[in-house]
């Protein structure tokens, strides 16, 4: 089936806000299982829960901007991945196994990748597994 066709929810529009919703991909831990697949700019997620195993949240297009506030994201391997710029404020990120949390594929000409902001809570390390030479992440 392939990673990019396993999503529970795919967003292809711009300027969309989701609040207090749970998006879960409950397929078995046998491969990729995307809960959220984004292909829009200026997407906002507030108080949402994203639950899956490998590849839970796909930040799917270079040059797009995503903002996660007070969200819960859990998974197993590289469960936040893709080329978008994404800010995470007050989010709880839970790794269900001792593996990499993110796999950014930030393009060389894009200034930012994944940006944890204030009140960042990460349950386990390691944080970042780059998917290309220019992957960017920032820890505060």
Label for each model-derived stretch:
Residues 1-140:
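Sequence-level preference for short, compositionally simple segments enriched
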